[in-house]
Amino acid sequence: MDLNLRNAVIANVTGNNQDQLEHTIVDAIQSGEEKMLPGLGVLFEVLWQHASDSEKNEMLKTLEGGLKPAQ
């Protein structure tokens, strides 16, 4: 990912409150546009970098559960 894109995404949401961040995330997911994926990746990177070990484990469990094959 281009470093300028990462910085642009961070600059675009810096200072946003929780409602604004949620709107950004939900809008990106609901749009279904692949061009939104890098931005979500940057947000996940920030989340991961600021999470405790227990929060990281919880995220990994959630991801694992969400990615299990349908039975």
Swiss-Prot record:
Subcellular location field: Spore core
Pfam family, one: SSPI
Induction: Expressed only in the forespore compartment of sporulating cells.
Keyword terms of this UniProt record: Sporulation
Entry-linked InterPro entries: SspI
Major subcellular site: other
GO biological process: asexual sporulation; sporulation resulting in formation of a cellular spore
Family assignment from sequence similarity: Belongs to the SspI family.
Stated name of the protein: Small, acid-soluble spore protein I
